[in-house]
A protein has these predicted regions:
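Glycine-rich phosphate/diphosphate-binding loop of Rossmann-like nucleotide-binding domains
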Residues: 2-29, 81, 95-176
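N-terminal ligand-binding/catalytic initiation module
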Residues: 1-83
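Hydrophobic/aromatic beta-strand patches that form the interior of the parallel beta-sheet core
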Residues: 34-36, 86, 142-144
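Short, ordered loop/turn segments at secondary-structure junctions
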Residues: 38-39, 64-67, 88-91, 146-148
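Gly/Ser/Thr-rich loops at beta-strand to alpha-helix junctions
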Residues: 63-70, 91-92, 122-127
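Short, acidic/small-residue loops that bind anionic groups at enzyme active sites
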Residues: 80-94
């Protein structure tokens, strides 16, 4: 429901994207991947389907599931399966962003604890990027969505993920 640049295009239309990602797994990681697109958006149905087929796989790579549903699905699968679960939209993006930030800070001679980071878009990738840069030492991070800066006390356009985000970022409660 969240194919990059295409949005919610449905499972049949998403299949070529997933097949391409499987090719990348094989080419660059030597991993035989199998694309599976589901025709449901219900988190419970997605979790149940993956649990039911997981015995045949050594790991699960979640892809292109919209927020906030993707967070619930990933968490439940990590708790309920005994194989690795990876959500590429979150963690793949976050690792690349952290590497870029570390290298940029080396070039400009700044320390990670001294920078202010602004994240535009608090979906799967934005939240994961925020978490990884905070774990690396960023103290001042502000996330923005279509309503503006996310801060503790904001009421408009919030959900449970943005509530967590508001409690854990934007220490000076900047608005705008």
């Amino acid at each position: 429901t969240a194919v990059l640049g295409l949005g919610d295009i449905g499972p049949a239309a998403a299949m070529p994207v997933m097949e391409g990602k499987c090719q990348l797994f094989k080419e660059f990681g030597g991993v035989d991947a199998f694309p599976i697109c589901l025709s449901t958006k219900d988190p419970h149905e997605i979790v149940q389907t993956i649990k039911n087929i997981s015995v045949a796989f050594g790991g699960i790579n979640l892809e292109d599931i919209s927020a906030p549903r993707c967070f619930e699905i990933e968490e439940r699968l990590k708790e309920e399966l005994d194989i690795p679960v990876f959500h590429d939209d979150q963690h793949g993006t976050a690792v690349v962003v952290l590497a870029a930030l570390i290298n940029a800070l080396k070039i400009v001679g700044k320390k990670i604890k001294d920078v202010k980071v602004v994240v535009n878009g608090i979906g799967a990738a934005g939240v994961a990027c925020s978490k990884i840069v905070m774990a690396a030492g960023v103290k001042n991070i502000i996330g923005c969505d279509t309503t503006g800066a996310i801060y503790e006390g904001r009421q408009e356009n919030m959900n449970w993920v943005k509530d967590w985000y508001a409690r854990n970022t934007n220490p000076t409660k900047e608005e705008g």
